[in-house]
UniProtKB/Swiss-Prot annotation:
SMART domains: EXOIII (SM00479). Homodimer. Detected in heart, breast, prostate, skeletal muscle, testis, uterus, bone marrow, colon, small intestine, stomach and thymus. It comes from Homo sapiens. This is Three prime repair exonuclease 2. GO terms for molecular function: 3'-5'-DNA exonuclease activity; DNA binding; double-stranded DNA 3'-5' DNA exonuclease activity; magnesium ion binding; molecular adaptor activity; protein homodimerization activity.
């Protein structure tokens, strides 16, 4: 059971980066949608009854030019490249990005819960590594929810141990198609993936809010994906 306080704001997060953890990637695109708990507890629908994004939400999307090169696969999937970002004169993940991120989070009612799909294995450790490189921190009471193990856990509970759910895919695209019988738009752009993630969350909002209250992990327990070369922790 989580000992963290009940989150007031949920900040849905997605990162696009230069590659997988094995290449010690850098962030190239960052998108966050901040939604108050009350909007998740009372999802909105259009005239046809379809789920829509909350009318009140804050958005932040930034592109940045990493120092490390993109792997060919990462560039193919994301549509981003070092050349394209440099041509648009985008700086890297620097102090200005940190200040913008901190200002964005400071406008939200706390405590904050960061939400990402596969967040514990990718988004959170990578963001932690980039922040640590710059000596930056997030608010002390920030917690994290990874919707990938959360949805798997919820489905296991509903299936009472049967294997039927386990054979289904849990990528964002698979979940979106299963819940909405449609394909997500703008897949593998940070903002497009956050839009998809938020709709998936809204589809099972009551269950995921309860899961977050019980299972959210404190940001202080997130380990960086890798340490910068000059990090004191690397000194024996």
């Amino acid at each position: 059971m989580s000992e963290a306080p009940r989150a007031e704001t949920f900040v849905f997060l997605d990162l696009e980066a230069t590659g997988l953890p094995s290449v010690e990637p850098e962030i190239a695109e960052l998108s966050l949608f901040a939604v108050h708990r009350s909007s998740l507890e009372n999802p909105e629908h259009d005239e046809s009854g379809a789920l829509v994004l909350p009318r009140v939400l804050d958005k932040l999307t930034l592109c940045m030019c990493p120092e490390r090169p993109f792997t060919a696969k990462a560039s193919e999937i994301t549509g981003l490249s070092s050349e394209g970002l440099a041509r648009c004169r985008k700086a890297g993940f620097d102090g200005a990005v940190v200040r913008t991120l901190q200002a964005f989070l400071s406008r939200q009612a706390g405590p904050i819960c960061l939400v990402a799909h596969n967040g514990f294995d990718y988004d959170f450790p990578l963001l932690c590594a980039e922040l640590r490189r710059l000596g930056a921190r997030l608010p002390r009471d920030t917690v994290c929810l990874d919707t990938l193990p959360a949805l798997r856990g919820l489905d296991r509970a509903h299936s009472h141990g049967t294997r039927a759910r386990g054979r289904q895919g849990y990528s964002l695209g698979s979940l979106f198609h299963r819940y909405f019988r449609a394909e997500p738009s703008a897949a593998h752009s940070a903002e497009g993936d956050v839009h998809t993630l938020l709709l998936i969350f809204l589809h099972r909002a009551a269950e995921l809010l309860a899961w977050a209250d019980e299972q959210a992990r404190g940001w202080a327990h997130i380990e960086p994906m890798y340490l910068p070369p000059d990090d004191p922790s690397l000194e024996a």
